[in-house]
Amino acid sequence: MAAITASMVAELRAKTDAPMMECKKALTEADGDMAKAEELLRVKLGNKASKAASRVTAEGVVASFVGGNAGALVELNCETDFVAKNDDFNAFAKQVAELVATKNPVDVAALSALPLDGKTVDEVRLALVGKIGENISIRRFVRFETANKLATYLHGSRIGVMVEYTGADEQVGKDVAMHVAAMKPVSLSADEVPADLIEKERRVAEQKAAESGKPAEIVAKMVDGSVQKFLKEVSLLNQPFVKNDKQTIEQMLKAANAAVQKFALFVVGEGIEKRQDDFAAEVAAQVAAAKQQ
């Protein structure tokens, strides 16, 4: 039996927002397997435990740039929300996004070596670290180059979207980008949803359906129905259009004689765990108290 530590409980709670003792029970049942414990909580607590995908756990900004036939999104991270609002920090993020679009670096290392203001990008970053007093890092970027149209949308500075599309109406591209920011699809179509996400959803659906006590053939239909519902919910073309939920995105595009080729979505801090030392101590104290009861 794996030892369940306070930090493990804290991590699972941060991912799921489930009660601490429920997290401890799930980890115990899963023998310390974090992914399995998260699935157990989803089965037990339903959608409350599905917050992991959208929970923001780090600070920073997303910056965008479109010029000519290329566009880019960049995520620049820092330690606090205060620095994320700093003018110099935001100006650097915009410069980096423009460099990605115009210079087409292959990765963050290549980007960091590009010239900027008489220095390299990394030298400018380090100078900014010294000036501001917080660690700053270029986490990721995406670049589109196309003969089609590009649209970007920034929700504040924490969510960024870029869409490649065709069609005469530029408002369509803007609307789709805004929709992606609001609804956060994981793929363009149901066929493109990653297999591991589908399998994870199927396992959860199977466990929920099995608890219904219904015949096997009914359980199988329940599972298939749950998976199909999931695929529609997370694929862009099948989602109800956020500005008119009587239409799906696919129907809206068809009516506008437009099409979307691909999109990119960045959410600041997605998947990054923020240090929560005080919270871990609180968890440890409550777990210890529970053991004495």
UniProtKB/Swiss-Prot annotation:
Keywords: Cytoplasm, Elongation factor, Protein biosynthesis. GO terms for molecular function: translation elongation factor activity. Pfam families: EF_TS. It is found in: Cytoplasm. NCBIfam families: tsf. This is Elongation factor Ts. Signal peptide: none annotated. It comes from Burkholderia multivorans (strain ATCC 17616 / 249). The gene is tsf. It comes from the Bacteria. Belongs to the EF-Ts family. Residues 80-83 are annotated as: Involved in Mg(2+) ion dislocation from EF-Tu. Associates with the EF-Tu.GDP complex and induces the exchange of GDP to GTP. It remains bound to the aminoacyl-tRNA.EF-Tu.GTP complex up to the GTP hydrolysis stage on the ribosome. The keyword Cell inner membrane does not apply. InterPro entries: EF-Ts_dimer_sf, Transl_elong_EFTs/EF1B, Transl_elong_EFTs/EF1B_dimer, Transl_elong_Ts_CS, UBA-like_sf. Its main location: cytoplasm. One of its GO terms (cellular component) is cytoplasm.
